[in-house]
């Protein structure tokens, strides 16, 4: 605690203290573009050394909750620039969290009301997302049945993340955090229960982690590895995630792979509220 309020160098980024505000989904952006109220919200919290934003969908397809601000077009850049300027004016630093929910979405949120996408076709049933109910009102609904991505579509999503990372830096962010936790699209590919693919993104641990690692590498190439972080929730059970065969080996392999990449940081989220999954020693 004696060092909590002392400066810290985060991969070349000077933080005024070691307090970090974790990302929190707010669903307060009615037109999906951040406004002055969003800027005020983050500026009020800029006394922390580092802020991590709420999840920002990298595409319309990646959205799983109403009123979440995106980062995939020029209008988003203009809106988020107000936020970064407000935070920097208070001496704060801020990373943008890049997000694709995969199967954790609903047809009412998808372009053309089509099925959300995932590694496979297993529906998340013991959970809800914030979308439009049958009456057209905002509320909790069970995620829709997903469809499995084609191989070329997986690569397109990787490109979406890289594009959004570039836009985030253009908007003035100090870096980006890839959301690979909490049962969203990367968790869906890592799970051998959900990922039954037979292409280069399914089967072995090496193949199931390929999507995440290719995305990390693409984002790092786009904006520089010192501006890139990743959030993981090993052995998480939130959003209808279940144990799967080879789970220990999967997370061990991810750890080894990340150790070879000089990222800004790795953000781990432990979910004791949601699960009592046994964790391996160490």
What are these regions (language model features)?
Residues 1-282:
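Flavin-dependent oxidoreductase catalytic cores
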């Amino acid at each position: 605690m004696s060092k909590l309020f002392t400066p810290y160098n985060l991969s070349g980024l000077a933080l005024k203290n070691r307090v970090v505000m974790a990302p929190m989904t707010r669903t307060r952006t009615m037109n999906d573009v951040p406004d002055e109220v969003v800027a005020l919200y983050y500026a009020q919290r800029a006394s922390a050394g580092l802020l991590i934003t709420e999840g920002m969908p990298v595409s319309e397809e990646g959205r799983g909750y109403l009123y979440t601000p995106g980062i995939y077009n020029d209008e988003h850049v203009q809106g988020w620039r107000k936020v970064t300027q407000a935070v920097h004016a208070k001496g704060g630093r801020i990373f943008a969290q890049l997000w694709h929910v995969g199967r954790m979405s609903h047809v009412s949120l998808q372009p053309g009301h089509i099925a959300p996408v995932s590694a496979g076709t297993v529906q998340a049933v013991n959970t809800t997302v914030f979308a439009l109910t049958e009456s057209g009102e905002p509320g909790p609904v069970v995620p829709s049945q997903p469809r499995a991505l084609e191989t070329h579509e997986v690569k397109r999503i990787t490109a979406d993340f890289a594009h959004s990372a570039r836009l985030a830096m253009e908007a003035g962010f100090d870096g980006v955090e890839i959301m690979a936790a909490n049962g969203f699209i990367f968790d869906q590919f890592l799970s051998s229960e959900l990922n039954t693919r037979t292409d280069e993104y399914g089967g072995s641990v090496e193949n199931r982690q390929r999507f995440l690692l290719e995305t990390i590498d693409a984002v790092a190439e786009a904006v520089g590895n010192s501006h890139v972080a990743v959030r993981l929730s090993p052995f998480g059970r939130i959003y209808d995630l279940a144990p799967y065969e080879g789970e220990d080996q999967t997370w061990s392999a991810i750890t080894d792979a990340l150790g070879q990449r000089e990222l800004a940081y790795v953000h781990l989220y432990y979910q004791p509220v949601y699960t009592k999954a046994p964790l391996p020693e160490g």
